[in-house]
Amino acid sequence: MRAQPFTASVGYAGASVRADFIRRTYQHLAGAVLGFIVVEALLLQWSGARGLVRTMTGGHAWFIVLAAFMGVSWLAERWARSGASAQMQYAGLALYVVAEAVIFLPLLYIATYFSSPNVIPTAGIVTALLFGGLTYIAFTTRRDFSFLGSILSLGGFVALGVIIASLLFGFSLGVFFAGLMVAYAGGAILYNTSNIMHQYRPDQHVAAALALFASVALMFWYVLRIVMSLASDD
């Protein structure tokens, strides 16, 4: 007999079900981070990496990259939230991890070959500490941060508009914007961690892991930009 899918959120489930859901979510998050590292390392060692970076960053190609990434992200999240099959959910998570690795390639290529060797480890440690602190706050306070959803949606559209304007008119966003985006990513981590405790169904651990991974990746991107900027000023 086929198992019936969960219909109620994990917030209404028993303690053992919640604990199992949280454990599986963070296991899948760890797997996504590890997968990202492996794919990124392979891309950086690939002989065609330099040419791909030039193609991605030349002219208005970055618009195409961003549009493709947004489309892939939408598709991946839809697959990950699918209740049809576990295979489709895992396909969504894997697709998103690969897409993140590709869009990170230009930034990490520059950080690897043209910046201090300490910038990537430093950014990784800072991101991990911020993520750990925000996760601790969300789990210890047990507050429902779902109210952040509308704020994050509005902020995301504003940030996207600023990024597109910078690409069109060629101005640098600078460290201040990067700092604001780190704060935005922190809000997204609080929001998604709260959803893990209150909103997701017990069978949506893959989707929950994808949402957390997206927030962590966003934070790492802008923390790395800040660290690279500070390193270049030394």
What are these regions (language model features)?
Residues 1-234:
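A hydrophobic alpha-helical transmembrane-helix feature that marks the membrane cores
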